[in-house]
Regions:
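Glycine-rich phosphate-binding loop plus the immediately following alpha-helix
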Residues: 169-204
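C-terminal catalytic subdomain
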Residues: 4, 191-292
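Short helix/loop capping segments that flank catalytic or ligand/cofactor-binding pockets
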Residues: 71-72, 162-164, 237-239
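Helix-loop-helix
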Residues: 86-120, 247-270
């Protein structure tokens, strides 16, 4: 898979000091992967030209991390990956927590998978001049606090990390992309050949069938101390660097998410040559949104 060359540059700049405090519900840590992509400071919510986007509204949390690939792998669309990620997050929020709602939902609430399908259709309709099936794509994580439950829907390699009231931490991650990538490295089909195909891996692109492919479930809210939606750039310490397991990552983000983000960037800067030699992006977008 081609990699956006902006993602292979020097270390990202500092983006504000550690606050020494946990995130409040709905708060976000977001740090773009490269100096060529303007970053967002700790307090602001202004748009970020990185691939990750996130939002929180009325108990619903959504994070989308667009694939930072070169334009030749998304030839059907004139829009950048960050446009797609932002549009997708907004569309999911509009499906589940519309800003023009006049009161509580009457009847059965829409299922998360149905909301994702509606959001994919809505984003496609926003750029009819493009071939959305050959356009950008993203990972997607959605949670909703509904009644006594925390519902979730997870697709591709962004994560939902839940810290329970007993202190245990669980990471929910769709591992199909990594399984396909492992087969590709062993001589099998490439991820681009197997994306959104039966037996392959799935992403949020334009195919509404992806809505039926997310990992779904729920937890009693009474058992949940905190939950975070996280891009794979934020969970690199678990999957790539092996410096943390899910338990240690959850404890770190609960204590000081900015310190965790700075630690990731410092680790990457120290190992830049080795990461390049391995064909790995030196940096990836960090996005962590607290859902509950």
């Amino acid at each position: 898979m081609g990699v956006d060359p902006r993602m292979l540059g020097p270390a990202s700049p500092e983006v504000g000091p550690s606050t020494g405090a946990p995130l409040e519900v709905g708060e976000l840590v977001r740090w773009a992967a490269h100096t060529a992509i303007p970053c967002q400071d700790a307090a602001g919510w202004r748009p970020l030209r990185g691939s990750a986007a996130a939002g929180h509204r009325a108990g619903v949390a959504v994070l989308a991390d667009g694939a930072g690939v070169s334009a030749d792998l998304r030839p059907g669309c004139e829009h950048e990956v960050d446009w797609f990620s932002t549009a997708l997050v907004t569309a999911v929020l509009d499906q589940l927590a519309p800003t023009d709602a006049l009161g509580p939902v009457v009847g059965e609430p829409v299922a998360l998978s149905d909301a994702v399908a509606g959001a994919l259709d809505a984003v496609r309709a926003q750029h009819p001049q493009c071939d959305a099936d050959a356009g950008p794509w993203a990972t997607l994580v959605v949670t909703r606090a509904l009644g006594d439950e925390l519902e979730y829907w997870v697709l591709c390699d962004s994560s939902l990390v839940v810290q329970f009231t007993d202190g245990q931490v669980l990471q929910l991650l769709d591992e199909r992309l990594e399984q396909v990538a492992g087969g590709w490295r062993a001589g099998g089909p490439s991820p681009t050949q197997t994306m959104n195909t039966p037996g392959g891996w799935w992403s949020a692109r334009a195919d509404v069938r992806a809505a039926g492919q997310g990992l779904t479930g729920s937890f009693p809210l009474a058992d949940v101390r905190a939950a975070w939606l996280a891009s794979d750039g934020a969970t690199r310490p678990i999957e790539l660097y092996r410096t943390h397991d899910a338990q240690a990552w959850g404890e770190a983000v609960a204590q000081d998410p900015w310190a965790l983000a700075h630690g990731i960037r410092a680790y990457e800067a120290q190992r830049e040559a080795a990461l390049r030699e391995a064909g790995t992006k030196v940096h990836d977008d960090i996005a962590i949104l607290r859902a509950v």
